[in-house]
Amino acid sequence: AMVGVEYYDSYKKGFSASGYGSPLSDFQDLNYTSTAAGVRQIDSWHYRQRILSFFGRVNYDYKSKYLLSLVLRRDGYSKLPKDNRWGTFPGISAGWVLSRENFMESCSNVLSYAKIRASYGANGNVSGVLDANGNVVTGLDYYTVQGSYGIMKDKDGKIVPNYNGKVPLMINDLPNPTMRWEKSYTFETGFDIGFLNNKYILNFTYYNRHTQDKFAEITLPSHSGVSSFLSNNGEVQNQGMELELTANVLRTKDWKFTVSMNTAYNKNKIISLPYNGLPNNMQDAYQVYTGRKLA
């Protein structure tokens, strides 16, 4: 058995300043840029995300014939709304090594190993709410704002806010208080067979994965003032089969030569989207809707 705790904390902050109109190109110093109104600009930002996880696993092995594993995770993500911050993800897997049964001894010279396996489990995902740099994209922050907006200089050259002497805050994205974990439920079964003292090994796997509350952006009308809106807006099914054959052609103390070949068949399909995905689910010039097969 095993239990554990994992804590992840990421904090990023940055500062930038820019200007133009410098008479010199050899010195990169804002002091040489133009002092005209609106030329020099400054900006700063900060961002933090935290993940707290509790997990455990219990394995059972009876005479290397009957195998059972139980796992459980509970994860909390700070950037999700408070009521949806935590997710629980269980899993179970089992295996039966037939080649260790007494009734298989008569064919052990040919069938050296045989195992049947199956598993079912849930996984949580929040990576869809982050961009390539690890920053949260639209729809998660209740207050995503831009700070010193509209800074300018008065007639005496003094820097002042542009809006009636006040520093305004501008909402950058619409909040989504219903955001929650993207969840995938996967069933998998298959077998592993070894022939002639495992000189030839055959592996077969079938899987069926059902993803719920999938992250995707919904395009909004231009008059709303926001171009898109991140939500848990659909269900997707992925299923397929994989077959692999391995031949251990040469096995000596100093040399090993192995040849493997594999093939796979996969089918992905959209199960559901709000309003059937039409007309507000154009994503990267690719229209998605209920029943459509994905490449």
Feature locations, PLM:
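Extracellular/periplasmic, surface-exposed regions of secreted and cell-surface proteins
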Residues: 1-293
